[in-house]
From Swiss-Prot:
Homology family: Belongs to the calycin superfamily. Fatty-acid binding protein (FABP) family.
Organism annotation: Rattus norvegicus
Protein's name in the database: Fatty acid-binding protein 12
Domain of life: Eukaryota
InterPro entries in the record: Calycin, Fatty_acid-bd, ILBP, Lipocln_cytosolic_FA-bd_dom
Amino acid sequence: MVDQLQGTWKSVSCENFENYMKELGAGRAIRKLGCLARPVVTISTDGDRITIKTKSIFKNKEISFKLGEEFEEITPGGRKSKSTVVLDNDSLVQVQDWDGKEATIRRRLVDGKMVVESAVNNVTCTRTYQRV
């Protein structure tokens, strides 16, 4: 599954991102900038370590991890969270925990595109990426 997600991907559509960011507590200006961003995501592996690099006009971010092992990350919104990534059927699923809250980010292939569903509470955002 991870092999299929390797490569570089450019955001081509985004649904409900502003509401998702609002649910995370992001201010109006950050939410608006986030909606305009068309991030480019590069997923690579080195042995059993997976790296996800995200570049956008808003912020650049990189996480590197092993499946099933907890790691700390600073989210683009500035939250310090503990995250774990696992394979779940056809998806790479990341769970972020911070201050008693939890967000889930599910990455999977659908018709040759990478679909990323991010959820917190009952609010879900869907970003679709096309391979570059």
